[in-house]
Each structure stands twice: as C-alpha cells, then as structure tokens.
Amino acid sequence: MSLPHPVTGAKFPSPVPPHTGWPDDPATSDTPVAHSRDDVVRLADTESLAELSARSTVCRACPRLVEWREQVAVGKRASFAGQPYWGRPVPGWGDDRPHILIIGLAPAANGGNRTGRIFTGDRSGDWLFASLHRVGLANQPTATHAGDGLRLDGVRMIAPVRCAPPENKPTPEERDTCSKWLDREVRLVLGSVRAVVALGSFAWTAALGTLGRNGLVVPRPRPKFGHGAEAELGHVTVLGCYHPSQQNTFTGKLTEEMTDDVFRRARDA
C-alpha cells in the first residue's frame, strides 16, 4: 500500500524503492547493490560523494539489518501508520565540504529509518538540531522529514551503521562491514574537516577508528570517551558529547548548555 509523504504528498510504498521521487534520494534504478562485505569494499571505492551516498542507500550486505529495517517499515509504529517508511540504509547528510563532522550510532527504527535522513523525526534529533540552530550551524531548530527545508552550515552527519539495528545494537560484523562506507565518506570530506563531534562512546570509537584508517595519528594511550573529552589528531579535533537520547536528556545527564558548549567548541575549532 502506498501512503503520502508528509511533506510532498507524493505516495510511496514501504520500503521506498530508489528513484521514485523521495526527497533527496541519491539512488537511481541503476545504482549497483552490495550483497556482501566484499561488494561493499568494491562499491565504496568511488571518488564521488554523491555516488557513494547512492550506493550505500541500496546496500543489502547484512541480512539481519535488512530484515529488521524492512520489517519495521512494513509494520510501522501506530503513531506513524499513515506515513511511508524509507526502510533503507540512511546516507551521510549535510555539507559536502564540512568544517564539522557529527558521528552518531545508527538510524532510529522509527526516526531515520522512517524519514530517510539521519537524526530526523525522533527525540534525539529534536534535541540535536535545536542545539545546532542555537549556535548558528542550522537554519531551523526542527527536523521532521526529508524535504522539510532544513540546511546545515558547514556540518555533515554520518552514522557508522547505516541501517536501523534491532534494539539499537549492531553486531561487530555489521559494524565492520558498514565501516567501509564510513571510511570512504570520511576520506572524501576529510580535507575540509577541522572538528569531529562523537555522540556517545560507540561514535567515539568509530571516529578514532576511521580517522586512524584515513591516515591521522591516534594518540597513545588511546583517548577515552567522556562528555567534553577532546583529542587532537593532526588537523582534526575530536570532541566527545553524550548521545542526545531520552535516557540522557530526560534525566539531566545531558543539558542544552552542555550540548551547545560542545558545538560551539567544534564551530570555533
């Protein structure tokens, strides 16, 4: 059954096939599909950021993740029953020549997996984009869906795992397979990057790992994650920030000022 997109009104099935008019869908009907880790290694080997995004959004290399993301897209949360679900891997998004990279964990099952854009359509994203707007890095404080007019200024967001995982916990094998997309995307934008904000310990580990694999020297002993933690890797400053999950924001472990402070430091790096 096809349902109307909340912004454009165009109707889509769930999951959304590529090249059918979803806002900002980078893939075409001819975009090659990865069915294995070896395929990911081969298809991530491109010098085009747009093509990398396209290829990553049709990836089917991890059977458990494919099954889960599509199961959620078909079943839908009751509050979103009238909307189509993207139900595919979620690409990096934002400025193509970013000053700041924001690295998270994975799309939320009913957030990015529904909207097709990282940190969009869930409480974590509400918190994150409000902060980016307050410090002058986003043109609006809200993110509801792809095509909603949101723009980032000098910022790009990437999830180390591009599919929504069951219980928000990817396996080591899934993480390692998806790291090939991550590594290439970081390589393609690294020349302009001066700060990386890692949202949570998983993101901190992923950030240090991909920067190291892209030629930057990771300090020894390896820097530990903490809110406000800072590590210098060549021309890049890595900053730690608690993940803006409800577990952290509802309890006061992460406040608006704490979040804003990290993004101000990243902005000024």
Where do the protein language model's features map onto the residues?
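A polyanion-binding, active-site-adjacent surface
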Residues: L3-A269
